[in-house]
Design a protein with these regions (language model features):
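Peripheral docking tails and interdomain loops at the edges
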Residues: 1-2, 10-14, 20, 25-28, ...
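Secondary-structure transition/capping motifs at alpha-helix termini
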Residues: 13-17, 61, 80-89, 111-115, ...
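A short acidic (Asp/Glu
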Residues: 4-9, 31-34, 77-80, 101-104, ...
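Short glycine-rich or small-residue beta-strand-to-loop segments that form or flank ligand, phosphate
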Residues: 64-68, 116-123
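Charge-patterned, long linear interaction tracts outside catalytic cores
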Residues: 63-65, 69-71, 77-78, 192-205
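A short, gly/pro- and small-residue-rich
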Residues: 37-46, 84-90, 129-145
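Generic long, charged, amphipathic alpha-helical segments
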Residues: 74-113
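Active-site phosphate/pyrophosphate-binding segments
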Residues: 1-73
Length: 205
């Protein structure tokens, strides 16, 4: 909520006008973790283009996988990480896609250049942020000397943004979260064209 407040405030307080496009799904309004302390609204606080959690030195040493994401899928990923008590996975959220936050990302991932790098989205591969951010994010990873390539996890490219079958949607969503947080890179590489249910003998989306 604080970041949403600050982006609106920034838009109105600037001495010039340009379009602001916000994508805010309703489901996050009901999520218990979607809260901000009062201090995040005041005392010189501002809009954050990139958000990540603070880690202690011991916690940092355990991290070997970075998940980049944007939007509400963060809450599902974090819930799953908390449920399984995964100490090796760290999430970096892109709160602004354009202009792309090169500098903020650069600073945020320098010390993680040894980690596996994942971009996770629930949208099909030809939708969502992936096709826009792929080369931009790869350029940042190159600058910080990342040891591993960037892997995509999301739904298979499709003509429609939705499956039309709720059970199918949930099964794919569960698989996306599992791949991003638990699967090894070999399994992720096999799914690089996107998640679908064809292997479960269900219709392709």
């Amino acid at each position: 909520p604080a970041n949403y407040f600050h982006i609106l405030r920034r838009q109105m307080m600037r001495d010039f006008r340009k379009p602001l496009v916000l994508m805010t799904p309703k489901s996050t309004l009901r999520h218990k973790a979607n809260t901000s302390p009062l201090t995040d609204f005041v005392n010189g606080s501002t809009f954050h283009r990139v958000i990540s959690n603070h880690l202690s030195d011991d916690e940092y040493k355990n991290v070997n996988r970075i998940i980049f994401c944007s939007g509400k899928i963060y809450f599902e990923l974090q819930d799953h990480i908390n449920e399984l008590q995964l100490k090796n996975v760290y999430i970096i959220r892109l709160e602004q896609l354009y202009p792309f936050p090169y500098e903020a990302l650069n600073e945020g991932i320098k010390k993680f250049n040894h980690c596996e790098m994942i971009w996770c989205q629930e949208e099909p591969q030809n939708m969502g942020a992936w096709e826009f951010i792929e080369n931009r994010l790869k350029s940042v990873l190159h600058l910080v000397g990342a040891k591993n390539e960037l892997h995509f996890i999301g739904r298979r490219a499709a003509a429609s943004p939705a499956t039309g079958v709720f059970d199918r949607h949930l099964a794919n969503q569960k698989n996306i979260i599992r791949l991003a947080t638990e699967a090894n890179l070999d399994e992720i590489e096999k799914e690089k064209s996107g998640v679908s249910l064809v292997k479960y003998k269900l219709p392709i989306e």
